């Protein structure tokens, strides 16, 4: 090679190296970074640990389908009212029509609304289970959520079964106005009928549980259980501080703070939740 061609060859070699580097790609979703401690881990490692960080025990949000897989005996799940869908009684529109938002969210999540309900077994013990899903419009409680949970509790009362509801919600769904707010009383009324039959209701609060859900069925459990460091509140922290003109503690509205002040009965890590629920169910069954 002549000396005059050497710079050209060098540039071609550099371009080849750059091209080769660009071809190295990492598949989307392969890695997950913990929001709390910053640990970088394989997604499958996180999933295997029930979406709990193996280093700091931070609890990632879990979908309703993941919750069913985590809690219910394999092959025993019988879903209820899967075809119930919300209408748009107010013709509500913000950035888009509410009716279109429902369709878009249903397509994205493969859910019809923000709760799944059904009957299954936990180590052979039959239970009625409702699982709210924060992915569907922030787990907001509209007429379908209220109707599905009410039907679930009525079935539990009729068949004399314990009921468990896993809460994950931003509160009442503003797009349905008063129809959303009335679900608080509707579900609470069904719970009262369940209670009069001396049947067990367990409320499990996950992050976040706020607004009208907190103000109704989330806090009506015979035992109220929460995941660690869950955000549990009615109004937002900033709203309260501006109203009372005082600074709030750093851990205010956390499950640990509420436990210390007597609002919760148990704080149970997700990895132990199934075994703890089974233990409570068996204690209740053996004493009745």
Swiss-Prot record:
Keyword Lipid biosynthesis annotated: yes
Organism placement in taxonomy: Eukaryota, Rhodophyta, Bangiophyceae, Bangiales, Bangiaceae
Family affiliation: Belongs to the AccD/PCCB family.
Described purpose of this protein according to its UniProt entry: Component of the acetyl coenzyme A carboxylase (ACC) complex. Biotin carboxylase (BC) catalyzes the carboxylation of biotin on its carrier protein (BCCP) and then the CO(2) group is transferred by the transcarboxylase to acetyl-CoA to form malonyl-CoA.
Pathway: Lipid metabolism; malonyl-CoA biosynthesis; malonyl-CoA from acetyl-CoA: step 1/1
Cofactor list: Zn(2+)
Naturally occurring in which organism (per UniProt): Porphyra purpurea
Protein's recorded name: Acetyl-coenzyme A carboxylase carboxyl transferase subunit beta, chloroplastic
InterPro entries in the record: AcCoA_carboxyl_beta, Acetyl_CoA_COase_Trfase_b_su, ClpP/crotonase-like_dom_sf, COA_CT_N, Znf-ACC
Positions of C4-type zinc fingers: 34-56
Chief site of localization: plastid
Subunit structure: Acetyl-CoA carboxylase is a heterohexamer composed of biotin carboxyl carrier protein, biotin carboxylase and 2 subunits each of ACCase subunit alpha and ACCase plastid-coded subunit beta (accD).
Keywords: ATP-binding, Chloroplast, Fatty acid biosynthesis, Fatty acid metabolism, Lipid biosynthesis, Lipid metabolism, Metal-binding, Nucleotide-binding, Plastid, Transferase, Zinc, Zinc-finger
């Amino acid at each position: 090679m002549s000396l005059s061609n050497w710079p050209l060859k060098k540039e071609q070699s550099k371009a080849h190296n750059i091209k080769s580097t660009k071809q190295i790609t990492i598949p989307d979703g392969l890695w997950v970074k913990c929001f709390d401690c910053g640990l970088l881990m394989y997604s499958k490692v996180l999933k295997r640990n029930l979406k709990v960080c193996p280093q700091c025990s931070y609890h990632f949000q879990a979908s309703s389908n993941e919750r069913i897989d985590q809690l219910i005996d394999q092959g025993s799940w019988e879903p209820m009212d899967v075809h119930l869908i919300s209408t748009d009684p107010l013709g509500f529109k913000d950035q888009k029509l509410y009716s279109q938002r429902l369709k878009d969210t249903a397509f994205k999540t493969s859910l019809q609304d923000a709760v799944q309900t059904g009957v299954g077994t936990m180590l052979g013990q039959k239970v009625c289970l409702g699982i709210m899903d924060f992915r569907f419009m922030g787990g907001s409680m509209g007429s379908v959520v209220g109707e599905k949970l009410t039907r679930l509790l009525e079935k539990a009362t009729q068949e004399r079964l314990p009921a468990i509801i896993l809460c994950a919600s931003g509160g009442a769904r503003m797009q349905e106005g008063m129809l959303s707010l009335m679900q608080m009383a509707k579900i609470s009324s069904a719970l009262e009928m369940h209670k009069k039959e001396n049947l067990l209701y367990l409320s499990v609060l996950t992050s976040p549980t706020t607004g009208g859900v907190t103000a109704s069925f989330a806090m009506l459990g015979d035992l109220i259980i929460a995941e660690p460091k869950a955000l549990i509140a009615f109004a937002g922290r900033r709203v309260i501080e501006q109203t009372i003109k005082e600074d709030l503690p750093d851990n205010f509205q956390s499950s640990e703070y509420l436990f210390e002040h007597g609002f919760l009965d148990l704080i149970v890590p997700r990895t132990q939740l199934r075994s703890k629920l089974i233990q409570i169910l068996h204690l209740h069954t053996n004493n009745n």
